[in-house]
């Protein structure tokens, strides 16, 4: 298998790529990335990869525009090195929240992302918990849409399975995600009824019974942390005994880590789809690795096996 498969990490996800490499028992290929004084990026692959299947790990975290350009340049380098196939492992798909025209004269940037990745020469995308599942339809290449929900669910069963819990969707669009966790915990669900506002949604009511229960709020992304902390405050006000926040992707923009650490949330559970630097770590944070499921997905693609057990 190692002779046919090559694994690369560009810049954003070296720790996760290392875990994937450890699972697959292959080395990470050496990539030299240079940045010129004007910000231009140049990539050089340090070994012959002709005829191989290339797997590139790159999330759209931190500076999403820079990460995207690095990925496109990497894909071009691989194509010109005569690889057999180019498979993108993008745990966190950037611009996913711009998946439709919410108002007139707005772009659909999630679709533009798909166009750029395909036009550059990618043959497949493996991603995790897209903000909007319909983004899969923006591509004309195979998409493997994996989920960290089973891993988060297993952690919750182990640590909160004996408690009286309720799984909370932070809005109506998150009900399906919350239901998947609730089914694993054999727990009821509740929904936060939000009224959209320009800068911060207003929670109008809680649909469901949370009194006396451990409320587990399940989302796909924690960005600024405002949504998670305001959800916790209203749930505690309605009688929840404690609040746990779960999300696959921890963007942690601005002062999110400080906000979450100082909030009424007991624990924040997330995955390593985004590599958080040391200054973004905090005591309440629990990180669950998705390296194994990504490694299994790569194995399945490489060996032409079904990925159904991973969904």
Curated annotation (Swiss-Prot):
EC assignment: the record states 2.7.6.1
For activity, the cofactor(s) needed are: Mg(2+)
The entry's ATP-binding residues are: 38-40, 97-98
Q: Which UniProt keywords apply?
A: ATP-binding, Cytoplasm, Kinase, Magnesium, Metal-binding, Nucleotide biosynthesis, Nucleotide-binding, Transferase
The record's GO molecular-function terms, alphabetically, read:
ATP binding; kinase activity; magnesium ion binding; ribose phosphate diphosphokinase activity
How many and how are cofactors bound here?
Binds 2 Mg(2+) ions per subunit.
Q: Where does Mg(2+) 1 bind?
A: 131
Q: Where does D-ribose 5-phosphate bind?
A: 219
Q: Which residues bind Mg(2+) 2?
A: 171
Family, as annotated: Belongs to the ribose-phosphate pyrophosphokinase family. Class I subfamily.
What is the protein name given in its UniProt record?
A: Putative ribose-phosphate pyrophosphokinase 2
Tell me which species this is from.
Listeria monocytogenes serovar 1/2a (strain ATCC BAA-679 / EGD-e)
Q: Which gene encodes it?
A: prs2
């Amino acid at each position: 298998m190692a002779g046919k498969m090559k694994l690369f990490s560009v810049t954003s996800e070296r720790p996760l790529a290392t875990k994937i490499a450890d699972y697959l028992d292959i080395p990470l290929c050496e990539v030299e990335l240079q940045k010129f004084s004007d910000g231009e990026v140049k990539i050089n692959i340090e070994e012959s990869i002709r005829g191989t299947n290339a797997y590139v790990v790159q999330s759209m975290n931190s500076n999403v525009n820079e990460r995207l350009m690095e990925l496109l340049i990497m894909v071009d380098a691989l194509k010109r090195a005569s690889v057999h196939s180019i498979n993108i492992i993008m745990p966190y798909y950037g611009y996913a929240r711009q998946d439709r025209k919410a108002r007139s004269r707005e772009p659909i940037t999630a679709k533009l992302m798909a166009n750029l990745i395909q036009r550059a020469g990618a043959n497949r995308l493996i991603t995790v918990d897209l903000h909007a599942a319909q983004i899969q339809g923006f591509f004309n290449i195979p998409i493997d849409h994996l989920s960290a929900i089973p891993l988060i669910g297993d952690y919750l069963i182990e640590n909160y399975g004996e408690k009286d819990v309720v799984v909370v969707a932070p809005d109506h669009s998150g009900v399906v995600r919350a239901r998947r966790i609730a089914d694993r915990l054999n727990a009821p669900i509740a929904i936060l009824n939000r009224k959209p506002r320009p800068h911060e949604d207003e929670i109008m009511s809680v649909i469901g019974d949370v009194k006396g229960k451990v409320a587990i709020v399940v989302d796909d992304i924690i960005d600024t942390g405002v949504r998670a902390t305001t959800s916790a405050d209203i749930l505690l006000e309605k009688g929840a005994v404690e609040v746990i926040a779960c999300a696959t992707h921890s963007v942690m923009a601005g002062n999110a880590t400080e906000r979450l650490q100082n909030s009424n949330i007991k624990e924040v559970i997330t995955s390593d789809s985004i590599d958080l630097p040391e200054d973004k770590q905090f005591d309440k944070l629990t990180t669950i690795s998705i390296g194994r499921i990504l490694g299994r997905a790569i194995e399945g693609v490489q060996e032409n096996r079904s990925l159904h057990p991973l969904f």
